[in-house]
Each structure stands twice: as C-alpha cells, then as structure tokens.
Amino acid sequence: MYQIHFYQDAAGHQPVKEYIQELQSGNNKDSRIKLNKIRDYMRILELKGTRAGEPFVKHLEDNIWELRPLRDRILFAVWINESFILLTHFVKKTQKTPKREIEKAKRLYADLLERSAEK
C-alpha cells in the first residue's frame, strides 16, 4: 500500500488539500460528486500506485503524473519510500494537459526537493 502526502509550500499552503476542504464545505451536488470521485481515485492510487493506469492515472513527463477524476486533474509526483506527493490541481478544459500546469507542478516539486534537502 502506498502513502499519499500533500505538497505544502513555504507559507504553509496545501493547494490540493485546500481544494478538497473547499469541496467538503460545499453544499451542492456537484461538490459532493467531485469530492467522492477524488477520494475514490486517491484510494486507487494508495492501493495500486501508478500501476492503476488509465483512466485513473496517466504519466505526463519526467516525474509528473496526473490523477484523473472526472474533469479534475491532480498533478502528483512519486516521492520517498513508495509514496506520492499531490502537488497541484486544475479543471481540465482542453483535450491536452496545459503545459503551464505541468511546468507549475515541476516548479512545486523542485521547491519541495530543495526545501527537504535543507533539513
């Protein structure tokens, strides 16, 4: 079984965790559906890792993967000791994952590596 961690920036913000909490506080049906689907996909990632394959996870480039619940995308990276770090999220509106979202995930991952090396 794999572990899932949430990326936290230097200011203490956790973008993916905050998004999930936002969905939890939503009172509409769409929020509940999204939240349940994200939780289901996170459970699959915990159980099967990247071997779950499509439609659950997809490799994008380098160390960046995407979790694919509905139109939501959660970009993550493989982390230490068979774990994953959820970096960022967005709602997919085009056929192809936007390059700027992949670059953002790479920046966050590089930041995480740099800050963890300082410890």
Predicted regions span which residues?
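ATP-dependent carboxylate-activation loops
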Residues: 87
